[in-house]
Amino acid sequence: TKEKPDLPDPWLLQATLQVQDNRLDAAQASLQRFTALAEQLPQEEARKAGLTQAYLLHAQIAEKRQRFDEAEAWLARIDNSDELFGAQVRRASLLARQGRLSHARALIQSLPAATPEDERMKLSAEVQLLRNAQQYQDAYELQGRLVALAPQDNDLLYDQAMLAEKAGHQEVMEQLLRKIIARQPDYHHAYNALGYVLADRGVQLEEARQLIEKALEYAPGDPYITDS
């Protein structure tokens, strides 16, 4: 920025580093300088891409300052297709943190889904919103739709089992975990979760011990298992 102060990209890089260092006022000043220079770029694609990154950094600064409405407003300015989905998901998260969960869900639902993968990403983002808001029953039901789109995905099924537990459906959780183990005998997280849920209930304690030992056998160094 000192050697070539009229080039926009170094200002954007400097702002990025300043945000990482929590030098927010300095980052904001760098972004203002970048924006002034970027708006003069003749290439529309380069200008748009640069401004998108600047808006994302502005949103990050506002979020660090707990100004969630301001952060959401910056994200709303992004219309770059490459960044649109991620930006809208962040917007939805900020709306939910402000107690506007229904608005957040509507925003996710309004996103275009040109492919089945897009639809899965939308549902996954909405499930995460509900999980963060502790709306476990709704999250569990929506996760069921996600599983239906990819019924052979054991990771999705495991997440559904965990949400079933949060929503108070202990028997469903057990059924789903046993289904995963039957389909993928080395899925150690399922052994661990099922073992501990049985132990917590004080039932089938011998099976619970065997399940946990099996989990450790498959993943001896997994800190999640050794800590649980």
Regions found by a protein language model. Give the residues of each.
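Alpha-solenoid helical repeat scaffolds
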Residues: 1-228
